Amino acid sequence: MSERKLFTSESVSEGHPDKIADQISDAILDAILAEDPDAHVAAETAVYTGSVHVFGEISTTAYVDINRVVRDTIAEIGYTKGEYGFSAESVGVHPSLVEQSPDIAQGVNEALETRQDASQDPLDLIGAGDQGLMFGFAVDETPELMPLPISLSHKLVRRLAELRKSGEIAYLRPDAKSQVTVEYDEDNQPVRVDTVVISTQHDPEVSQEQIRQDVIERVIKEIIPAHYLDDQTNYFINPTGRFVIGGPQGDSGLTGRKIIVDTYGGYSRHGGGAFSGKDATKVDRSASYAARYIAKNIVAAGLAKKAEVQLAYAIGVAHPVSVRIDTFGTSTVAESKLEAAVRHIFDLRPAGIIQMLDLKRPIYKQTAAYGHMGRTDIDLPWEKLDKVEALKTAVL
């Protein structure tokens, strides 16, 4: 019998406590960038019953009404009723934002290449906002070149939110989680969905039988292609039996606690840095986007079926200290050729990434729920496939 393997990824809805925090942090970032594209922002958020704390470091000429941004974000998510234990108008908002450390700022505003080597290249001016390593990934399992388990997991919780916000399923509340287990064949191709887990917050009067029927028929079967489902697929719908208390009333939330949900669902390695609330001088964010951009174009060019790109930086230095590409034995050319082509085509200095992907714009709040990578519902610059021909030519 051929060997088959299972892989599982999860996602969470926009109403999950950690995702509320991410969205608030990115809403603040967007509000600042709309007035001051050169701002340096590191905005962290903590949420719990009846309270939001916003803290971190910001250098900007902009004035932003933090209180209003927080409340508008919470209302947009759907926390508008007192019985949720967390509502837009009654929540306490406690901002505590300070100026960015001058020790960090001197390395970001004037990179080592400019200070030490007197470089005149304007793209050498910005140094990395911190040391670190970042990964980007792509695989040919889905049209958006993402792993199937995380792709399906995101789409399931997005569908729940659509049904809730449209009023089609009126008993749904904002907090929800999904988890999808996919079975792979001996060639590492996805063949079926083995297990689907969905937990969704709900009003107290609805029966679990009704929730199960609605979730299977109106969420799972509308999102997961029928050829992946069979009579052996397991469905766990609200397996605790009740999920009325949710959101920040049920659990506290913090910015940056869903980094695997934000990326590839554990299918690829992760450098550990979170995204939300950070401007593009923070390579945790911008270099992760650049690495995804590279990996996606490599796979789209047919140069590999699967590609993982690692970038690494030193704080205050513009050029990356390393670039590595791993195609897991699927490349059609030597990986050394791919690395040389990537270094030639993509400017991986922070200022180069910012320019290449136009990252000084207020585009970040929309990424703070349902994944930063592989999005088909919004237009993100790191998802473009405009380097395919350049890569094909460069490896000849």
Curated annotation (Swiss-Prot):
Known catalytic reactions: L-methionine + ATP + H2O = S-adenosyl-L-methionine + phosphate + diphosphate
Protein name, entry field: S-adenosylmethionine synthase
Annotated CDD domains: S-AdoMet_synt (cd18079)
Top-rank lineage group of the source organism: Bacteria
Subunit: Homotetramer; dimer of dimers.
Pathway: Amino-acid biosynthesis; S-adenosyl-L-methionine biosynthesis; S-adenosyl-L-methionine from L-methionine: step 1/1
Species this protein is from: Streptococcus suis (strain 05ZYH33)
One GO process term, biological-process aspect: S-adenosylmethionine biosynthetic process
EC number: 2.5.1.6
Segments for region (Flexible loop): 100-110
Subcellular location: Cytoplasm
Cofactor section: Mg(2+); K(+)
Annotated Mg(2+) binding sites: 18
Main location class: cytoplasm
